[in-house]
From Swiss-Prot:
Primary role: Plays an important role in the regulation of tissue responsiveness to oxygen deprivation.
Gene induction: By anoxia.
Protein name per Swiss-Prot or TrEMBL: Protein anoxia up-regulated
Species for this entry: Drosophila melanogaster (Fruit fly)
UniProt keyword Transcription present: no
Keywords: Stress response
Amino acid sequence: MVYESGFTTRRTYSSRPVTTSYAVTTPRLDLCTDRPGSHRSRASSDYSYTSKSSVEKSSYDSSNPHSYRPERSTYTSTVEKTSRSGPGGSYNYSTERTSTTGAGPGGYSYSSTTSGNLPGGTKYRHFSYHV
């Protein structure tokens, strides 16, 4: 008589958000004076948005009771947008920064993108990435 035995390894994943925070700055209107007697309103729009989220993820192998491995990762994204109007024309730029901790081979990754328009019609864009 031949007995055959087999087992199935099951890996269970669980993920739950731990912390989430938001910060938003509303636009504002400034009043400036170029010379006495003349008033001109300058619209300056500042916008800032920050999102931070922490996720705790764990993996467990049912065939090995000592295989519990908690993993924690943090994700942060910041978007800033600023517009200015001056004698040389309008100036606006937008910056977006994203950083993740606990992910990837090195455990940390960071990327930043900056773009905008300078007075005179000059456009610029900058991107950086770090692992």
